[in-house]
């Protein structure tokens, strides 16, 4: 048979999209099983199990929705028939049912109102109370309070044939920050004594001239490198990302630091001088579905040009 390529599986039994042979020699970023990774801990974003009640662009809407849910919960405490009732007041998850069946009384807590990153560059108000959060993973030691300060590198969890995505955030992340989920590498962790670095010093010592406060910019610069994305495309789609110990670290640190500043402070970027904002007296927010026209014009699409 002509024009056929003989394929042999590699040591990891990959037939197609074979992983790079040197990936295992790179530094692990996270490992739940032992202490051989650069970060002491990494975590998924919070999974509320009831986004329609706990998240919104309006703070008052979140407060009202959660007060109604908690009132409904309290009013029906002890009545297991409530599960069979149709209601818009509450969403029953397994964890909430367990509390309900233990007759656990719950109340609204104003100090659990957070601003979080719901989707990339999309902030919302969150009601982040462990009692009303289906899965919080390790977020309780990353953002234990509203006032907790932290920077996270949020990674796309399942690339599934797409490039690795990495976004620097300084807010509580949703579990589905990216499609397929996200994993987050925090700069700090918190305990009863306060915050401490999440960088494991024993692993950091393997890097020449890399300090703890340069770790995140260094990683950020690497993960936004086209060379890294192309070389380890198959690896990061199947395994947790790793990083190389490069000689020219300062170059990646500088680029990573600039990108982090841009992505963290995107709302403070000055508007272009030539941009004019025109306000309509009677604005229309009706969106017309985009579609291809039968006879293509120079754009090829019919779009709503009243809003962006």
Segments (PLM) and residue ranges:
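Sequence-level detector for compositionally biased, low-complexity segments
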Residues: 1-308
């Amino acid at each position: 048979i002509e024009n056929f390529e003989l394929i042999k599986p590699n040591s990891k039994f990959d037939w197609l999209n074979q992983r790079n042979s040197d990936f295992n020699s790179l530094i692990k970023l996270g490992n739940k099983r032992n202490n051989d990774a650069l970060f002491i801990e990494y975590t998924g974003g919070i999974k509320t199990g009831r986004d329609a009640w706990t998240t919104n662009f309006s703070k008052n809407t979140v407060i009202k929705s959660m007060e109604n849910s908690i009132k409904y919960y309290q009013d029906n405490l002890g009545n297991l028939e409530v599960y069979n009732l149709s209601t818009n007041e509450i969403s029953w998850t397994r964890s909430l049912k367990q509390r309900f069946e233990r007759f656990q009384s719950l109340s609204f807590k104003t100090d659990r109102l957070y601003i979080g990153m719901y989707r990339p560059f999309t902030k919302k108000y969150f009601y982040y109370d462990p009692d009303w959060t289906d899965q919080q993973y390790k977020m309780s030691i990353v953002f234990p309070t509203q006032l907790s300060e932290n920077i996270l590198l949020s990674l796309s969890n399942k690339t599934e044939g797409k490039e690795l995505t990495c976004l620097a955030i300084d807010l509580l992340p949703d579990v589905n920050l990216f499609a397929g989920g996200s994993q987050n590498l925090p700069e700090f962790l918190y305990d009863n004594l306060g915050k401490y670095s999440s960088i494991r010093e024993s692993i950091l010592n393997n890097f020449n001239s890399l300090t703890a406060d340069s770790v995140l910019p260094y990683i950020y610069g690497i993960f936004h490198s086209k060379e890294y994305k192309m070389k380890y495309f198959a690896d990061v789609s199947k395994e947790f990302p790793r990083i190389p110990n490069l000689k020219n670290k300062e170059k990646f640190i500088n680029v990573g630091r600039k990108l982090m500043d841009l992505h963290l402070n995107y709302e403070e970027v000055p508007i272009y001088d030539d941009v004019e904002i025109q306000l309509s007296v009677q604005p229309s927010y009706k969106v017309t579905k985009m579609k291809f026209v039968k006879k293509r014009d120079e754009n090829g699409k019919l779009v709503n040009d009243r809003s962006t």
